[in-house]
Each structure stands twice: as structure tokens, then as C-alpha cells.
């Protein structure tokens, strides 16, 4: 490709409304342009990267035995009503009526459509197992699209769905998809971690997320320092206390705390050990008999809302009680709540169950109890794992301690079981002629999100530093003063032809531009390898090669340059 016949569209200045580095660099490098909130057009450079990501995804899915299909982006609402997600999904599901007043949605995912397809096309166990995938545009009407294509409303996704009659083949396909996703990210040269994850709105039993590691990642990953164990912070298991509860050494006493509205203020004003305090959070209950439930964690711990949402007594989705409701039920507001004398179900974190002589709100405004002890001042409450893990704690496998990293979720695999097939009556006849509900798996990769995640992991102060496999071009040719030197023009043109003939993606900057502008553009768009041609190089019979990632420069003889560059890509 020649720059003179290409839409390069680079920008010197960082756009003011671009929050994260990938959004900034995708705009500056001329990869995308915003059409509306969360909607982007891909310019040639961006599309080249997107297509390379897509190609790797497709190759690995095919290797894993999945079969490509294509389903419509527009889906009939009847299917969503059938599974119950028409009411459950919320405003992210964009709904509309056609000219005949029939309800439709823009698909954020395709479980309903694929299940409907399979129940009509597959009738016998002999046709199973089956794993079908597509690479298709999705739409989620995000309340606040941000970070460019990282969290846009319209995005490109690979979604696969597998169908089984038995758990063994479902597990086999799950493992095959796990390996395929690992292969995809490895081939792209990205540092990543597969982590145990919550199944979220899709549902199901087993779930893993695949995260590209980046300091800007929205997700916190808890991983073991001594094994491969890793989990999203929402899913990471807190260790059970190994120590016994200490004996009571303090009397229960009521203390005035007018200026202590938070745990931090309480600790600072009264010189308390934060591990001797608890936080009491009131949420809505799941039953009429218990409309409110108290959740209690240690003062230095954070409530894990995903874990709390799964408690039988807690209404789902989790909803914190408003202050007016709390005051009406307890007589005090947030900041003064605690377990002593509380007339509602109480669920404490396991770490709270071994506490003694601790402080908590007294359920009176501006008052706390100090010296609280279980089984003396109140019955020991029901305990569960309801908190986030903390760095340094032992991991569940016993092979290390927790460390933390930030990641960007780019893939998610689920074992759905019969979540969708049962509600949609997707069945086949088994070998005995008996009707069986299909087991399902679901496997998604954010194709367009990978592009942004790769940039978040690979950039410097000059621009993007693409991994070789997904760079828009592999080699950039920079002829110095090409339009003033016939020798430079001839050598540059010949090199361009030779590299193109060798199957190398090459960009020849044949513009009448200053060398500084040409170098800056090549570095901004992140081309891994550049070859500089000038009269001095020609006199010496060498090209000047520069590696974008390392900055290394070296002279390469004319007759060796093609093999040299091909070897770098091997």
C-alpha cells in the first residue's frame, strides 16, 4: 500500500474527549472516527487490524472443530419472551417495532436465536455434539458508552454455542474452547490470564473470563503466586479463618461518636484497630417475612456484591435499602448500624465470625458499641463468604497467596446447561428414542474489544506498538527525499515490489513530506519494522532497519533485506 493512495488520517493532538490511551491512539492513528455516542466507523488502518484479529479468531475456532454460521442482528421479540429475558435484560436491550407493529430487538447476544435454530434443525442424538459460531455485530444500549471501542454500543463479537446430550461432551467442548481462546491470545502476542468468573446475566454453572493484562483494566483479577489459579475479584474465594475466636476481654459499652460517620473516622478518632471494627450494610430481602437483611463485613474488607446477590435471603438483583427505609425499620441511619439488637436476618462474613471485642454501630444515631462479643452480647449469626479477597491471603488451592492485577475482559466461556434449551423446549431423541433436553455451552470473544485491549498493553509515548500478528502493516518503507532523488525512488519502488511479492504487508510512504512527519506517523500507527532509504544508505549498499518495539537500529545489505524481514515474522 502506498500512503499517497491511502487514507492515513493521523492527528498530532490528543482529542479532549478521549479518556483512555487506546481511545486516544485509535483516534490519533486514524483507526476510528466517532459517529454518535458509542458508535464508530473504522477507517482503513483500524479495519486492517480488526480483520487480522478476526482471521486469527476464525482460524482457531475452525481448528477446534467449530462450524461457522451467520445469524441476523435483528431478532424477533417472541424468542426473548420465551426465555424470560424480554423482561429481565433491562434497557440495554434495544427494542423496536417494524411497520407491521411487531416487536424486535437488536441482538446483544444470540442464545435465543441459536436455540430456536437448533430445535428446528436437530432432532437426533446422532447429530450431536455440535458447536456453531459466528462473527457478527452486536448492539447493547449502554447507559454511558465510554473508552472508545472498549465499551461501545455497537461492537463486533465472535459468539459460539455448543449443544450436547451428556456432560462429558459438554466438558470436552468447554476445554477445547478454553484452549482455543488461549491460542488466540497467544498468537496475538498478548499477555493474558484466564480467570474463574461469575456467569452474570447469561447464567449457567461453569464460567471463565479471558483478560488481557493492562494497568487501565476495569476488572481486578486475583491470582495465585504459586499456581495457575486466577479468578475475577467477584468470584475469588476468601479463605476460611484458621484461628479460633478470641476470648472476650472487654465489657460491652455504649460510646458517643457524633463525628464518626465512617469506619475511617471511627478508627482515627478513637484509635481503634480497623480489624476490630465491622461495617453493616442493609439490603432488600427476598421474602415478605424478611424484607430487609443485614450484611456485615470486617472494617477493612469490602462487600462482594456478586457473592451477596447469590444468598437465599437476599433479593436478586442485589439492592441496597434507601436511608428512609432503614430509618423506618431501625431508627438510625447508615454510619450508626450494627448487629446488636438488630431485628432482621443477619449474615456475616466468615472473617467476622472469629472476631472478639469489636466495635459496631449501636443502631442509634451518633453512637457505637465497643467491646462486642459473639454469644455473649448477641447470638452468632449465619456466616458466608461475602467479601472481596485481599492481597497476601492464601488461595483456595493452598499453593500460594493472592496477588492482584488489572485486566480487560476480551473473552468469556460458559457452561449454560439447560438454561435456554429447557425454556425453549429444545430437545432431541436419544438412542433409546426418549426425548432429552439439550445441554448448552456459550463462548464469546470481543473481536473489536481485543483491538483496544492490545493497544492498552502495547504503547509508548510515541504511539502504538503493535504485536506482529495484528499490526496493520508489518513493514514501513521511509524513502528520504524520494521526490528529489531518482536513486531513492528506484530503490524504494523495487523494495516495495520485492516485499509485496514475498507476501509481506508493507506501507510505502511516498508523500512529499518532511522526514520528521513520516517517522512520527510510522511510530504513531505502530508498524513493527521500518526501513529507511537515503542517498547515504545507497552509497553504502545498505538499508537502515529500525525495530518499533525495541528501538534497535541496524544496517542490512540490499540483497539480504527481504530474507531479514521474513525471518523477523517467522
Curated annotation (Swiss-Prot):
InterPro entries: aa-tRNA-synt_IIb (IPR002314), aa-tRNA-synth_II (IPR006195), aa-tRNA-synth_II/BPL/LPL (IPR045864), Anticodon-bd (IPR004154), Anticodon-bd_dom_sf (IPR036621), Pro-tRNA-ligase_IIa (IPR002316), Pro-tRNA-synth_IIa_bac-type (IPR004500), Pro-tRNA-Synthase_IIa_type1 (IPR023717). The keyword Nucleus does not apply. Its EC number is 6.1.1.15. It catalyses: tRNA(Pro) + L-proline + ATP = L-prolyl-tRNA(Pro) + AMP + diphosphate. GO terms for molecular function: aminoacyl-tRNA deacylase activity; ATP binding; proline-tRNA ligase activity. One of its GO terms (cellular component) is cytosol. Disulfide bonds: none annotated. Its main location: cytoplasm. One of its GO terms (biological process) is prolyl-tRNA aminoacylation. It comes from the Bacteria. SUPFAM superfamilies: Class II aaRS ABD-related, Class II aaRS and biotin synthetases, YbaK/ProRS associated domain. It is found in: Cytoplasm. Keywords: Aminoacyl-tRNA synthetase, ATP-binding, Cytoplasm, Ligase, Nucleotide-binding, Protein biosynthesis. It is an enzyme of class 6 (ligase). PROSITE patterns: AA_TRNA_LIGASE_II (PS50862). Belongs to the class-II aminoacyl-tRNA synthetase family. ProS type 1 subfamily. Consists of three domains: the N-terminal catalytic domain, the editing domain and the C-terminal anticodon-binding domain. Catalyzes the attachment of proline to tRNA(Pro) in a two-step reaction: proline is first activated by ATP to form Pro-AMP and then transferred to the acceptor end of tRNA(Pro). As ProRS can inadvertently accommodate and process non-cognate amino acids such as alanine and cysteine, to avoid such errors it has two additional distinct editing activities against alanine. One activity is designated as 'pretransfer' editing and involves the tRNA(Pro)-independent hydrolysis of activated Ala-AMP. Homodimer. This is Proline--tRNA ligase.
